[in-house]
Structures are given as structure tokens and as C-alpha cells.
């Protein structure tokens, strides 16, 4: 019954009569199962744009989805404007800082050529 609610085809097993008494011999009925899969494929193609159940990492309203999106907060807040505080005044951009390693100083490097000759 739960498989019908979720949209999965139910599993039908038929025990075949055998001369040996064995409980491990059971086969699925191919005719009825193919009928269920045919109906299932038709129903999924018409409603493929809407997922049946949308939960997990991508759901921003669950705790796992909040952690995945790096968003910390209530999963389903009641009042969205509550607790935000007054609006902040936009701050003008700061002037660019001078890099302490960048300067216009040039250093003369003397290379001893005798080290390279063999």
C-alpha cells in the first residue's frame, strides 16, 4: 500500500508449484509487473516537472538543507520581518590600501659570472 502512495510499482511474487519443498523458489510475474511499469512510466512523464517529495540537501526549509546552503536560521520562520533590526546605512567604499611589499625602490643585483662557467 505504501508503494502505491509513493508512486512505485508494487512487487508481485508468485510461488511456482514444485516437486521439492523449497521456500526460496519464487519468481515475479512478468506480465503484471510490465503492466504496472507501463502505467508508472505514463504517469511520471506527465508530471515530471514537479518532484513528488522535495527534501534533503537542496531543501532550504530543512536542517540538512540549511547546513548544505551555509544558511543558519529557522527552518520555517513565522514572522520574516522580526529580529532584523533597523536598516543599515550604506557605507562608501574605502580607499585602496597601499601594499607594504610594493614600492618603487630598485635594487641593483650583481651576479658573479664565474659561478656559471665550468
UniProtKB/Swiss-Prot annotation:
> A Pfam family name for this chain?
RPS31
Q: Which residues carry this modification: Phosphoserine?
A: 117
Q: Which UniProt keywords apply?
A: Chloroplast, Phosphoprotein, Plastid, Ribonucleoprotein, Ribosomal protein, Transit peptide
Ribonucleoprotein found in the keyword field = yes
Q: Which residues form the signal peptide?
A: none
Where along the chain is the transit peptide annotated?
Answer: 1-55
The compartments listed are: Plastid, Chloroplast
Q: Would you kindly state one Gene Ontology biological process term found in this protein's UniProt entry? A: plastid translation
What is known about its subunit structure? Part of the 30S ribosomal subunit.
GO MF: mRNA binding
Q: Which family does it belong to?
A: Belongs to the bacterial ribosomal protein bTHX family.
- The molecule here is called Small ribosomal subunit protein bTHXc
Per the record, what is one GO cellular component? endoplasmic reticulum
Report whether Ribonucleoprotein shows up as a keyword of the record: yes
InterPro entries with a match to the protein in the record:
Ribosomal_bTHX/bTHXc/bTHXm, Ribosomal_bTHXc/bTHXc_plant
Q: In which broad location class does this protein mainly occur, judging by the first location in its UniProt entry?
A: plastid
Which gene does this sequence derive from? RPS31
Q: Give me the ranges of the annotated region Disordered.
A: 61-118
Its source organism is Arabidopsis thaliana (Mouse-ear cress)
Locate the compositionally biased regions of type Basic and acidic residues: 96-111
